[in-house]
Amino acid sequence: MSSRERKATDTAGRHSRMDPNLSSDDSQNPGAVAAANREVLDAGREDIISSGTERQQARKEKQDLVQEFEEPPNKVLQENREKFSRIMTSSFSAMEVKIKDVLKTQCEQRQKLCQDYSLQFTNLSRKLTSDAYKLKKQAETLSNMFMEQQKFIHETLTLQKNRMEEFKSLCEKYLEKLEVLRDSRGNSIAEELRRLIATLEIKLLMLHNQQNTAAPPQSLLDVLFS
């Protein structure tokens, strides 16, 4: 192996030995690593002998170098991919947990609010039903009282009317009896006078007869009340 091949091999070896200890910037910059790989390959390509054995050996060394240079970036990319996947999975998991917590809290708040409104509506409905029942009972009571008062007034008016009719009838009967009494009293007085006159005539005739028989004279009063 020529001095140039050894130099290229030593350079590749140094790059290979230094590669695991590269800084985070180099490990996270695949472009820079690929550029270094290309430079090393170009230098090795210029120094390789055109003989078959040396060419095969040089090709093998190049393949080894390529594998050595490509393995760390792929590993870094894989690690970064896995890390990013873990971060995304963790973020999505945390976001999902937060969303579930928010949805659960909102659901609980909605249920509590619904229960509160349902309880208030139930109590209000019960109060309205109770008030409506009380109002109905009061209306029925007032209606019954009004009907009773109306019935009492009607009965009172009917009774008063009957009493007025009875009083009117009694007054009419009293007037009729008073008129009859007045007429009968006049008739009885006339009859009494006629009876007294007839009695007086009879007594006068008897007196006249007695005078004719020479009896002592009597006064008119004696004749009337004898």
Curated annotation (Swiss-Prot):
<protein>
    <recommendedName>
        <fullName>X-linked lymphocyte-regulated protein 3A</fullName>
    </recommendedName>
</protein>
<keyword id="KW-0175">Coiled coil</keyword>
<feature type="compositionally biased region" description="Basic and acidic residues">
    <location>
        <begin position="56"/>
        <end position="65"/>
    </location>
</feature>
<dbReference type="InterPro" id="IPR006888">
    <property type="entry name" value="XLR/SYCP3/FAM9_dom"/>
</dbReference>
<feature type="coiled-coil region">
    <location>
        <begin position="155"/>
        <end position="210"/>
    </location>
</feature>
<dbReference type="InterPro" id="IPR051443">
    <property type="entry name" value="XLR/SYCP3"/>
</dbReference>
<feature type="compositionally biased region" description="Polar residues">
    <location>
        <begin position="21"/>
        <end position="30"/>
    </location>
</feature>
<feature type="compositionally biased region" description="Basic and acidic residues">
    <location>
        <begin position="1"/>
        <end position="18"/>
    </location>
</feature>
<comment type="similarity">
    <text>Belongs to the XLR/SYCP3 family.</text>
</comment>
<dbReference type="Pfam" id="PF04803">
    <property type="entry name" value="Cor1"/>
</dbReference>
<feature type="compositionally biased region" description="Basic and acidic residues">
    <location>
        <begin position="39"/>
        <end position="48"/>
    </location>
</feature>
<feature type="region of interest" description="Disordered">
    <location>
        <begin position="1"/>
        <end position="72"/>
    </location>
</feature>
